[in-house]
């Protein structure tokens, strides 16, 4: 838990650690209440608890390629890359790193351009905005 909190505080510009519960002052954090980009989470250090899986992912809707690149590199450095903007961090948490500009391409009223963007997206790991243009 402590390593994850340190990683998230370094990675996400809008990370806020709100409270922690350390039953043993010299031990590991048992629970933590934190927010990432204003979304609240409670994490628990539960040895032997259920493992993370891809059925739940946290979506990061970011502005611009530079922010996509920064987050993608940080998350996948010790994690793993998936398809269509999905990746998993070193702690097993699944993320979707999506530029807000992607939606305008996928929802383009010109159906040919929208389909081009969709087909391009299906071939990507990290999303590259410029490659969504027809």
Predicted regions and their residues:
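Short beta-strand/turn micro-motifs at beta-sheet edges
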Residues: 45-48
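Vicinal oxygen chelate
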Residues: 1-2, 11, 36-40, 51-52, ...
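Core segments of cupin and vicinal oxygen chelate
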Residues: 1-38
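C-terminal cap/linker of serine protease catalytic domains
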Residues: 112-134
């Amino acid at each position: 838990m402590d390593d994850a909190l340190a990683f998230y505080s370094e990675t996400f510009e809008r990370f806020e650690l709100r409270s922690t519960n350390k039953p043993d002052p010299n031990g590991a954090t048992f629970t933590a209440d934190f927010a990432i980009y204003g979304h609240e989470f409670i994490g628990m250090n539960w040895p032997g608890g259920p493992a993370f899986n891809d059925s739940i992912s946290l979506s990061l809707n970011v502005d611009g390629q530079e922010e996509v690149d920064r987050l993608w590199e940080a998350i996948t450095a010790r994690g793993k890359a998936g398809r269509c903007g999905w990746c998993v961090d070193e702690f097993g948490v699944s993320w979707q790193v999506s530029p807000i500009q992607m939606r305008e391409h996928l929802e383009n009223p010109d159906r040919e351009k929208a389909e081009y963007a969709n087909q391009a997206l299906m071939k990507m790991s990290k999303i590259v905005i410029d490659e969504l243009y027809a």
